[in-house]
Amino acid sequence: MNISIMLKPASSNCNLRCKYCFYNDLSSHREMPSHGMMSEQTLRATLKKAFDFAGHDRVMLSFQGGEPLLAGKEFFLKLHDIIRELNVNRAPVSIGVQTNGTLIDEEWCRIFKRGGYLVGLSLDGDEVADSLRIDANGNPTFSRALNGAKLMQKYGVDFNILVVLTKQVANRIEPIYRFFKKQNFKHLQFIPMLKPLRVDESGKPISKTTYNECFPSEQENYSMSAEDYSEFLQKCFAMYLKDCMDGKYTSIRQFDNFVRLARFECPEQCGMEGHCCHQFVIEGDGEVYPTFIASIATIWATSTIPISLRCQSTPLQPNS
């Protein structure tokens, strides 16, 4: 049975202060804003359990944050050593990392290439669209992130561009798409920033106070309306389709999965089958959560839930 594990080696720590970042805001309100940097001991214990469970099946490791590269190069070099040591069944291993790209240099690229990483690089388009992604000192990060992308192209590292689909990006999707094409970016993922419904899990309305706590008013300046999103989908799909018909295909993950669904194939994107994929999320201190979003809330820490309930609420199923 394939096993998918997301590790947060730097917890919520990040060198950027993106204006729309929900994770930075919510993590600041939890009892423990950061779970600290992941130790070699925690990494080793996690990988041992993963390889023991997987046997000869695939182990998929995804590193996210915060900014996972803050864990340092030695951490990822040690990762490679531990995999070689513990993967006694020679199970196939996939490694992914999601980064803002500002720390990427040539040595990082060599690490990515050597480990066969798939890198997700956050870049919201051209310099105008990327103005919401600033560092801790309020400085723009566009040129640093773009330089990281260029270095990965130089070293032949596989990477996707991850775009937070704000209102500003959606309204300028044509020039932004042309910018990505000009940079020869072949794989794009758009992550919609939509206002959440004012209802709880049972469908009952939630109070304005609770809504505002979960969704700060400043972020409403960047979130799309349903109309914004609809217009984006139409414009972007038209460009995607034209490029496909002209033999100039650029992968856009959401549309690729729409095509898979139209062909009665299973989508690979989380949530497109009507439910979240089964995944373990390991925080910097080794706490385990059932999903990435749940890791922002102390209540979902496995130490607070009886093991019998954990097993019932997050059943494992074969990964097709």
Where are these regions (language model features)?
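Conserved alpha-helical substructure of the radical SAM core
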Residues: M1-R110, R114-G116
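Disulfide-bonded cysteines in secreted/extracellular proteins and peptides
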Residues: C14, C18-C21, C270, C276, ...
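Short acidic/His/Gly/Ser-rich catalytic and metal-binding motifs that mark active-site loops
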Residues: L16-Y20, R30, E127-S131, L197-S202, ...
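Radical SAM enzyme [4Fe-4S]-AdoMet core and its adjacent flexible, acidic
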Residues: I134-S143, K150, Y155-H275, V281, ...
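Membrane-interface junctions of multi-pass transporters
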Residues: I296-S320
